[in-house]
Curated annotation (Swiss-Prot):
Toroid-shaped homodecamer, composed of two pentamers of five dimers. InterPro entries: GTP-CH-I_C/QueF, GTP-CH-I_N, GTP_CycHdrlase_I, GTP_CycHdrlase_I_CS, GTP_CycHdrlase_I_dom. The keyword tRNA processing does not apply. This is GTP cyclohydrolase 1. Keywords: GTP-binding, Hydrolase, Metal-binding, Nucleotide-binding, One-carbon metabolism, Zinc. The keyword Hydrolase applies. Its EC number is 3.5.4.16. Gene3D superfamilies: 1.10.286.10, 3.30.1130.10. Pfam families: GTP_cyclohydroI (PF01227).
Amino acid sequence: MEQIDKQKIADAVKVILEAVGENPDREGLIDTPMRVARMYEEVFAGLKKDPSVHFDTIFEEQHEELVLVKDIRFSSMCEHHLVPFFGVAHVAYLPQNGRVAGLSKLARVVDDVSRRPQLQERITTTVAEIMMEKLKPLGVMVIMEAEHMCMTIRGVNKPGTKTITSAVRGAFKNDDKLRSEVLALIKHN
């Protein structure tokens, strides 16, 4: 993917500041357009990445029971309003034939999928689909909890509300006991 055009972003931010009645050349705002451009380059860094590459290296271990990495902090930008949403992801899978991923790789996939204009529902589904395709586990369960600034600072103005999404694949879809185990472990401190 091409590099992000920071100058184009900075020019657009300057136009926005003028459109809302601000003077983009005043002290305090003079460097804001380029600061915003650099911020977008960082928060949209996932656009330039293929998150599935984190699972190119798989380890062979004699472990075929639940693996859960919980409370993976993430942030993203709502594609509808370009304001942040942030929260935690809980990612579980049931290895098959001893195929396990490095634990940090689960967090890296969540980060790469999140760092682009996004919807929480899509992040949840995409993480689950990548894991099913690359790890070939018996099942995957991804649960994400997030606060959306588009609900907090505008519109309904409901600070503190959380949106929870889930993607359930394979063995987790048909096994209530397995699903319940994941949910209990997520709640457990």
